[in-house]
Curated annotation (Swiss-Prot):
The gene is MT-CYB. Heme b b562 binds at residues 83, 182. It comes from Sorex daphaenodon. InterPro entries: Cyt_b/b6_C, Cyt_b/b6_C_sf, Cyt_b/b6_N, Cytb/b6-like_sf, Cytochrome_b, Cytochrome_b_C_euk/bac, Cytochrome_b_N_euk/bac, Di-haem_cyt_TM. Component of the ubiquinol-cytochrome c reductase complex (complex III or cytochrome b-c1 complex) that is part of the mitochondrial respiratory chain. The b-c1 complex mediates electron transfer from ubiquinol to cytochrome c. Contributes to the generation of a proton gradient across the mitochondrial membrane that is then used for ATP synthesis. GO terms for molecular function: metal ion binding; ubiquinol-cytochrome-c reductase activity. It is found in: Mitochondrion inner membrane. The keyword Signal does not apply. CDD domains: cytochrome_b_C, Cytochrome_b_N. This is Cytochrome b. One of its GO terms (biological process) is mitochondrial electron transport, ubiquinol to cytochrome c. The keyword Lipid metabolism does not apply.
Length: 379
């Protein structure tokens, strides 16, 4: 009798994705982040569901409903901080996952990569709307500043902003719709992640060498199931440590003040994971130019496969490209730091130089260096 897992209509999908899936024998821990992102998404959906049971999306009661969750609901504080810090863990895993893709040339799988870029946008949109929900000072002013950016779009800008607001300012209508979208988007993200996996399994995983691994494959289970479980345990350890020891480490103290449209906080800034993009936005003195740079800072990932000039897929055997990759990482860390600083000298010029370097590295320097490396190998 054939094994049920190989014949049952539902089980065989699971079997071909997580059990009998042929996987390269040499994939490193950098390949763990896909499963970690799946775990993060499940944590966020579950904690979010329980938060939604007690949250009210009304300007008058939103802030106090979050206070009520933290004070009166059984383990409400735990659920709330798991959700808030879970978002941070989600973005750490996302950035490492994308970084892995850039380093090892995983972007050569075009469909998988493009859906990944779409997923990144969806997660960023979800996180932004979630940050508005507690209706603290930074929630309100963050929503005002970011939605206002759309007014830079020629001709339809101001109408578009008022349409998104549902009025003439960020108010009850805005909060209600943001809650609705924040609730539905994670399920759309889950569906997209399924498509992301579907396309990945069409080609099979890449590996650190960037060479075809068809000659040397091993089953996903038990080798990579065990490896993924180790990764998940480390993720949960990091998340629970953050939640139980310093839950407010990554948050903004201004968000413990209820939203007040009459009082602007001295420094409006988003959560840490948006700071690099915020720094790029602020480094351009023109509003429309800033908005375009902000969108392009993420959308540039979709162009990366077309800028691949090397004859090798991975950076494993390309020392000059490796150096540039780590300069890019350092540049992004610099942008993250600048995004959290006030708009004054010397931060303005540092931010502008870091923004120029970011685009130059990806669009010009790295492709030219790849060509130079080809010549070194006489290819």
């Amino acid at each position: 009798m054939t094994n049920l897992r190989k014949t049952h209509p539902l089980m065989k999908i699971v079997n071909s994705s997580f059990i009998d899936l042929p996987a390269p024998s040499n994939i490193s821990s950098w390949w763990n982040f896909g499963s970690l992102l799946g775990v993060c998404l499940i944590i966020q959906i579950l904690t979010g569901l329980f938060l939604a049971m007690h949250y009210t999306s009304d300007t008058m009661t939103a802030f106090s409903s979050v206070t009520h969750i933290c004070r009166d609901v059984n383990y409400g504080w735990l659920i709330r901080y798991l959700h808030a810090n879970g978002a941070s863990m989600f973005f750490i895993c996302l950035f490492l996952h994308v970084g892995r893709g850039l380093y090892y040339g995983s972007y050569m799988y075009l469909e998988t990569w493009n859906i990944g870029v779409l997923l990144l946008f969806a997660v960023m949109a979800t996180a932004f709307m979630g940050y508005v929900l507690p209706w603290g000072q930074m929630s309100f002013w963050g929503a005002t500043v970011i939605t206002n950016l759309l007014s830079a779009i020629p001709y339809i800008g101001s109408d578009l902003v008022e349409w998104i607001w549902g009025g003439f300012s960020v108010d009850k209508a805005t909060l209600t719709r943001f809650f609705a979208f924040h609730f539905i988007l994670p399920f759309i993200i889950a569906a997209l992640a399924g498509v992301h996996l579907l396309f990945l399994h069409e080609t099979g995983s890449n590996n650190p060498s960037g060479l075809s691994s068809d000659a040397d494959k091993i089953p996903f289970h038990p080798y990579y199931t065990i490896k993924d479980i180790l990764g998940v345990l480390l993720l949960i350890l990091a998340l629970t440590s953050l939640v139980l020891f310093s839950p407010d480490l990554l948050g903004d103290p201004d968000n413990y003040t209820p939203a007040n449209p009459l009082n602007t906080p001295p420094h409006i800034k988003p959560e840490w994971y948006f700071l690099f993009a915020y720094a790029i936005l602020r480094s351009i003195p023109n509003k429309l130019g800033g908005v375009l740079a902000l969108v392009l800072s993420i959308l540039i990932l979709a162009v990366v496969p077309f800028l691949h000039t090397s004859k090798q897929r991975s950076m494993m055997f390309r020392p000059f490209s490796q150096c540039l990759f780590w300069i890019l990482v350092a540049d992004l860390l610099t942008l993250t730091w600048i995004g959290g600083q006030p708009v004054e000298h010397p931060f303005i010029i540092i931010g502008q130089l870091a923004s120029i370097l970011y685009f130059l590295l990806i669009l010009v320097i790295m492709p030219i260096t790849s060509l130079f490396e080809n010549n070194l190998l006489k290819w």
